[in-house]
Amino acid sequence: MVELRKVKVEEIDELSKLATKIVREHYDPIIGEETNSYMLNLFQTPEGLKKQMDDGYEFLWAILDDVKVGYFAFKPKDGKMYLSKLYIDKEYRGKKIASTIFDYLVKTTKSQNMTKIFLNVNKHNDNTLAIYKHLGFVKIKAEINPIGHGYYMDDYVLEYTL
């Protein structure tokens, strides 16, 4: 059974290492190593993760058989729940971990009297887009978000209505 547990501040280095492993493996082929390195340095370093925590994002581990196999982060934004990150180590995918996380997120969203969950997904992240579609998310728009130094995120915004 998958356990979900809040990431403690003292675990940020461990979180950064797992994030780097998963994100490097998954996104290098999609967005290229150079762009991915920039994004990792911006969002997945201990400093970047701490800043996101300070900005109100809640980070939780996904733990399977006492092994930290992934994590996710979310926060209320614009009257909806924003799922910022959901990453699972590739050797643990297909074990219903994402479904467990999604169920938790739905309950949390309801408990905060919100009726929608939204997220951003890279337009070329086909497998992830298919998973979110299977869960019931719909594409509501495309957007390009500059992140500095000539880099940008080319995403779809997906939304799920409870």
Residue ranges with predicted function:
Residues G79, F118-N122, V138-D155:
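Conserved catalytic-core motifs of GNAT/GCN5-like acyltransferases
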